[in-house]
């Protein structure tokens, strides 16, 4: 195949074709193990047939930023391991989106997403123990090392506090945030069978 930067060029063409004049941030196009590197921007490897491809990109339109992350199989067909990870992340994202409403505390969305990801990793055998103990120990951190989202608006990571007077901020009408959980299993993640390696 195609190089990651060639896929970036196709995406950039579509953005420009539809009126976007600039990216909201440097696009991330990661295939295979590169999909497991947060904020990977080299975009210079060949995409292999059995890789998962992660695109994290956004356009800027009328001064407002967007931020979209999607993962798909390069060959168009999920393997069993690909599908298992994809479905856990999708379930976490959908639950997080459902929780975004006025009155919900910022960290409540993180808790919902983390619970679903942790349970999913238990279900597929990558974590062992009880759900509550694993959440308390933050056992999913080697696989999911960031929060569920951030403010977005005139900037991709828009200004705004997550806490006020040391209390988690509650969402209000007009606030905009992302919900973008993920699972990243690099080849050097300890104790993980090889069939799960390089999934992100």
Label every model-predicted segment.
Residues 1-200:
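Active-site neighborhoods and metal-handling regions in enzymes and metal-associated proteins
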């Amino acid at each position: 195949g195609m190089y990651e930067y060639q896929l970036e060029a196709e995406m950039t063409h579509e953005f420009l074709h539809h009126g976007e004049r600039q990216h909201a941030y440097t696009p991330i196009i990661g295939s295979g193990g590169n999909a497991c590197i947060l904020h990977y921007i080299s975009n210079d490897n060949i995409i292999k047939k059995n890789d998962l491809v992660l695109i994290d990109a956004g356009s800027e339109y009328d001064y407002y930023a967007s931020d979209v992350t999607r993962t798909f199989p390069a060959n168009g067909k999920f393997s069993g391991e690909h599908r298992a990870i994809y479905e856990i992340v999708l379930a976490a994202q959908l639950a997080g989106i459902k929780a975004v409403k006025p009155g919900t505390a910022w960290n409540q969305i993180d808790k919902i997403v983390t619970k679903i990801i942790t349970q999913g990793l238990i279900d597929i055998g990558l974590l062992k123990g009880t759900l509550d103990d694993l959440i308390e120990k933050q056992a999913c951190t080697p696989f999911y090392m960031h929060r569920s989202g951030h403010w977005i608006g005139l900037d991709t990571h828009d200004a705004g506090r997550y806490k006020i007077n040391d209390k988690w901020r509650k969402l209000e009408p007009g606030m905009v945030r992302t919900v973008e959980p993920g699972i990243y299993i690099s080849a050097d993640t300890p104790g993980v069978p090889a069939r799960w390696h390089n999934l992100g």
